[in-house]
Amino acid sequence: MTRHQMREAAFLLTFEQSFSNDSVDEIVSVAKECELFEIDDAAVKLFRGIVENRDSIDTIIQKHLKNWTIDRISKVSLAVLRVAIYEMRFCDEVSDDIAISEAVILAQTYTLKDDVNFVNGVLASVNKDQ
């Protein structure tokens, strides 16, 4: 599994979690049973880190929204932002530029065009604030 595929799996798990209060293990188990996408240990580790740090991640997101609240962000864009910000702030092995680039690719794949610009803008603001 490539790093991009691992990131995409973590994004899909993060998106799924936005619809339930299930635990990380329950969400991963159901996703593996459905076999809609590949999930490896690295993807689960990334997803678990996102879930464990979600409040901090969401605080960072909210801080960088202009005239928005986090509740207005689409669930897809929010999942992309959570993955990227987790990697930017909590993973030393991933550079911010790579996290942002990968987030934009995920946004291009899964969101509307306007959301791609929104995601990129929020992440650029987070990156500048370090």
What is each model feature region?
Residues 1-130:
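N-terminal interaction/assembly modules
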